[in-house]
């Protein structure tokens, strides 16, 4: 199985299965001299971990990282950084009676056809459990970005049809407070609409169903000049990163699809001067032009489908092509809305793209 690596200069390779012994990630290309501890990574993993509240999967994982290599006297050495996170709360018995059945909305049909074998325990490699590796790598990327004054923040923009959009202008001067407000919310939403979102979630869960949602992410203080033209556009790499997250179904930057309904006079971001620097009066483009950052905040949205594992009887097929009923196995544990715990994953993937762009930007001019 190929394609387990992401990035160019700052490259991560993840490994492990949902019900295997452990999850892990190797980071190649991290600069030397970055002060790093396991706690730096663990505090990011905490926000993604299951069982943190009643709105997420009841699977109870410690999600504590061990740094195996790439560190000396508390600093990165430039050598590959190897991280491992042990799986502690695995219950594969719930999946034993359904290994020949194609689960609606899941990857076992496509994986089985492609590879001829599939680890059906909790979805194996296709499970969102893999994202724990991304958040671990993203913690290091965020630390590097923080050292150059860049912040990445994501929040739950919507659940179902209930939106909780926040106004960027209200928070651009106090990003740490915004981050804390988001993380104080069980839904990762700083909006007054969070209670309505919770109501939609509870209703779906009581009915044995699930619900989708949208995550919005923002990067502040990214300078003009990151990203490369044509095939390595900053937004193209962000899109690839976001669409690689399990259950993601789209990508928008700036006005996104709404731009198709606007006129040029509405969408064009006019130039201005602020603090004696060239800036923009608006930011409809979302922080990039020609695939290169403009210096404005980078704003993206990522929609997530409803969780495929639902407590409803669904018609399906087995490997022999026989029609059969599929029921959620007794004892299986799933998120009623994957978009909630996707918030720190989106943050991590955005940070990984940006730190790669940061390192790449060092090679574009020799003077």
UniProtKB/Swiss-Prot annotation:
Any keyword Amino-acid biosynthesis? yes
Recorded GO molecular functions are: chorismate synthase activity; FMN binding
Q: Name one GO cellular component term.
A: cytosol
Q: Sorted alphabetically, which keywords does the UniProt record give?
A: Amino-acid biosynthesis, Aromatic amino acid biosynthesis, FAD, Flavoprotein, FMN, Lyase, NADP
Q: Which reaction does it catalyse?
A: 5-O-(1-carboxyvinyl)-3-phosphoshikimate = chorismate + phosphate
- For the ligand (NADP(+)), the binding residues are 48
Q: Name one GO biological process term.
A: aromatic amino acid family biosynthetic process
PROSITE patterns for this protein: CHORISMATE_SYNTHASE_1, CHORISMATE_SYNTHASE_2, CHORISMATE_SYNTHASE_3
Quick check: keyword Metal-binding in the entry?
A: no
Q: In which pathway does it act?
A: Metabolic intermediate biosynthesis; chorismate biosynthesis; chorismate from D-erythrose 4-phosphate and phosphoenolpyruvate: step 7/7
The UniProt family comment states: Belongs to the chorismate synthase family.
HAMAP family hit by this protein: Chorismate_synth
Tell me, how does this one assemble? Homotetramer.
User: What is this protein's name?
Assistant: Chorismate synthase
Tell me which species this is from: Protochlamydia amoebophila (strain UWE25)
The UniProt gene name for this protein comes to aroC
